[in-house]
Structures are given as C-alpha cells and as structure tokens.
C-alpha cells in the first residue's frame, strides 16, 4: 500500500461559504452601488489629472471592532461632505493584515480575536461593515492579500491597495489586473520603488490565472488589465515623502513608461512607525502641494477615534476606538490633517491659476 504524500501538515479543512451565499445574505444596496461607482470614477479622474482634487485614504490601521468602525465612518462622512470640493475622501477599511512573522491576521481571519479563526463569520462581518460604510455615503478602500477574499467584498470597494510585502508577487499583480476598482501598489519594504512601478505596468496588461467563482468553483480568470493603478510611497530604509523622493519616484515611473501619479503614505516607514510623526509628514506633503506639485495625487493616513495602539490581553477589556495593530492618530488630529491638505489643494489651484494668467499675458 502506498504511503500518503498529500496534506501531511493539514490539521483540518472546513467548508467555506461561497461568495454567492454571503452576497445573497448581505446584498449591495442602490445607495452603496452609487457610492462605489461615483468614487471609482472620481479616483480615475484624479489619476488622469482631469480632477485636481487630492485622494485621501484615511482610517484605522485595521478594523477589529465593527461598531467602532461605523462610529468612525459616521464622523468621516460629515468631514468628506465638508471638504468634497478639494478632497476625495475614502475610508481605510482594512480586514486583512500581512504579518512580517506571526500575529493577528485581521477581522476576516479571526473575528473573535481569540484564535478560533471563524472565517465564515469574519467574511460576513467584513461585508456588513463595508455595506454600512457605503450606505452612509462614504466610499471604502481596503487591501487584498489573496485571490479569494475579493469575490466576497470587492463590489463594495472603491479603491484597493497591494501592500509592500506583496507588490512584487505575480499573483497580486494578476489580481490587480482584474479588479474593478483603482489599485495602489506600495513600494517594497526596503524602499524599492522600481518594483511598484513594474507592478503598475504589469497590472495594466491582461492576465490569465486560477481563481474562484462566485459559486465557489475553481476557475480560470481572464482579465482585461487595469489602467487605473498607481504607486504608493510608504518609506523603506528611510522615509520617502520629501520632494527629492518624489522627484526620484517620478523619474523611476518615467523610465518604466508609467504615469507620474504618486500617493504618499504618511504612516509606516515614512513616520518611523510612530503615529505622532504622521502630522509632520502631512505638513511636508501639504507644503509640496501648496507649491504647485501636481504629481502627488493622494495621501494615506492611519487614524482612529483614539490615538496610539493597544495589545489584546485575555481578561482585559479593550479601549474603544483604539487600534490593536499599528498606532494611529486620533480623530481631532485627523480633522486638522485633512483641513491642512484641503487648504493645500486650494493653494495649488491658485498657483495653477497664476501660471495660466502669466502665460496668457
């Protein structure tokens, strides 16, 4: 008798509810559909340069408490409306966390924060949160880590990110080529911008790859390519949000034949992983924009109701509205940062008007 050679390290396999089942239970509303489509079109226009507003992806590092996430969304929806003439605000709603080694992998993977890994529950919670956010009139952005999760929630996502650890991955470039929304690729963890530029170029082309259907069957996906992709500067061995770094990144994009459209992440290596440094990063970015910088089309900010972060400890209640992954700035600091960016966009418009008048004189 032949020895078993397969699944030797698989302890258990459970059935996963199909995307079709979850989407039927939590259908997308007409309001959510309008919000998603309007935001996607706005972001596309910002990327093409026909909309001079700034795209701002702002919200918690990760969602662990759906109630607090919707509370945050209600506040952000009002701010989005007030600053809509200068900023296209999209809430950061991240459910999956790539880990350098090990740790909590996000609401979808372990929604109860206890190692029970009730992924079927996590998928429903994620879809419910996205539905609630969109129904407030607030578009949502998230990071995708695999080829399966998008089938459950991508119809409620206006913008997606591919993280620094996965930008160089062929699978993720293929995924981006088939997503219906604009996608941002972060530079590598070491600061390498070339891999992000290559990813944007790769994702713009058609691909064929193995995937999963809404009915849960294995399939072959054939994509058209995604022309609405861009890079995200998130720092590496050193920060890369300054003017010299923007110039360097733009030169790399030009060499790769990719549009010089750049988003800057105020967190991660650009803040030295210290959330209290995010405001000074935003201030520097705002200064560049105020001076007429056109290549910066977006900014990311990690923000929550309460500043800082906390650990999940058995028997200890969590602080409401505070991150359990990376530290964030609090709500008041967020409002100040977004007002600063909105003022910068207004100043950039003045610079452009002045240049136009000078050329016309």
Residue ranges, per PLM feature:
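A contiguous, surface-oriented mixed alpha/beta subdomain in the mid-to-C-terminal portion of proteins
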Residues: 230-236, 240, 248-263
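N- or domain-start disorder-to-order transition segments that initiate the globular core
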Residues: 9-50
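Conserved, mostly hydrophobic/aromatic
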Residues: 59, 264, 330
